[in-house]
């Protein structure tokens, strides 16, 4: 049989071949229930290794520094995904996470919309939509999502995911940080 010709004599296009290879790769690697499936979260890794979260040791995929206990707990709590290199799982330290999140924001930004538009577009309430902080990648809680709506801030589509800012990464505006001058003067007189 000639290369690129199917059994019935039709020729396969290059895109079709790539799609077939991709499907074959996904079918071989990503089959659920396979014993050699690589864990995606820290909890899955703990189950596979039969270790507790307290015993788990991970390195940062970027700087190769060993993660501290708190960093491992945060990685698990924020439901971040493990990266596997040559069969070894890696996490990410907070410094590298912030650095590469900033790069991702600048390189892969798509567009921004308000909360009500996001609800209409996804046909879900904001509470149901997974929105991560674009600085630290922590999933936003309902209070943080509501703060965006209340203050008229937009959610951003970055690399195919919805993002905003968590309370820890929210930078206050100038009026929030500077006290009102009339109130400041009267407080000095009262003291």
From Swiss-Prot:
One of its GO terms (biological process) is symbiont-mediated perturbation of host ubiquitin-like protein modification. It is found in: Host cytoplasm; Host nucleus. GO terms for cellular component: host cell cytoplasm; host cell nucleus. Disulfide bonds: none annotated. The keyword Repeat does not apply. Its main location: host cell. A zinc finger (unnamed) spans 60-96, 133-169. It comes from the Viruses. Keywords: Activator, DNA-binding, Early protein, Host cytoplasm, Host nucleus, Host-virus interaction, Inhibition of host innate immune response by virus, Metal-binding, Modulation of host cell apoptosis by virus, Transcription, Transcription regulation, Viral immunoevasion, Zinc, Zinc-finger. The keyword Metal-binding applies. One of its GO terms (molecular function) is DNA binding. Belongs to the low risk human alphapapillomavirus family. The cancer-causing human papillomavirus E6 protein has a unique carboxy terminal PDZ domain containing substrate but low risk E6s do not possess this domain. Plays a major role in the induction and maintenance of cellular transformation. E6 associates with host UBE3A/E6-AP ubiquitin-protein ligase and modulates its activity. Sequesters tumor suppressor TP53 in the host cytoplasm and modulates its activity by interacting with host EP300 that results in the reduction of TP53 acetylation and activation. In turn, apoptosis induced by DNA damage is inhibited. E6 also protects host keratinocytes from apoptosis by mediating the degradation of host BAK1. May also inhibit host immune response. Belongs to the papillomaviridae E6 protein family. Forms homodimers. Interacts with ubiquitin-protein ligase UBE3A/E6-AP; this interaction stimulates UBE3A ubiquitin activity. Interacts with host TP53 and EP300; this interaction inhibits TP53 activity. This is Protein E6. The lineage of its organism: Viruses, Monodnaviria, Shotokuvirae, Cossaviricota, Papovaviricetes.
């Amino acid at each position: 049989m000639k290369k690129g010709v199917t059994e019935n004599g039709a020729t396969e296009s290059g895109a079709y071949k790539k799609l077939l290879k991709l499907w074959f790769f996904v079918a071989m690697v990503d089959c659920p229930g396979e014993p050699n499936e690589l864990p995606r979260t820290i909890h899955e890794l703990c189950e596979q290794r039969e270790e507790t979260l307290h015993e788990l040791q991970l390195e940062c995929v970027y700087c190769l520094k060993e993660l501290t206990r708190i960093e491992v707990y945060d990685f698990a709590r924020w439901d971040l995904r493990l990266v596997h290199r040559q069969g070894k799982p890696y996490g990410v330290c907070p410094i590298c996470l912030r650095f590469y999140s900033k790069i991702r924001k600048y390189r892969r930004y798509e567009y921004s919309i308000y909360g009500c538009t996001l609800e209409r577009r996804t046909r879900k309430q904001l509470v149901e939509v997974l929105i991560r902080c674009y600085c630290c990648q922590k999933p936003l809680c309902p209070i943080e999502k509501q703060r965006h709506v209340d203050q008229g801030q937009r959610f951003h589509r970055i690399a195919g995911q919805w993002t905003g800012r968590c309370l820890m990464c929210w930078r206050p505006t100038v009026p929030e940080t500077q006290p009102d001058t009339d109130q400041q003067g009267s407080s000095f007189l009262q003291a």
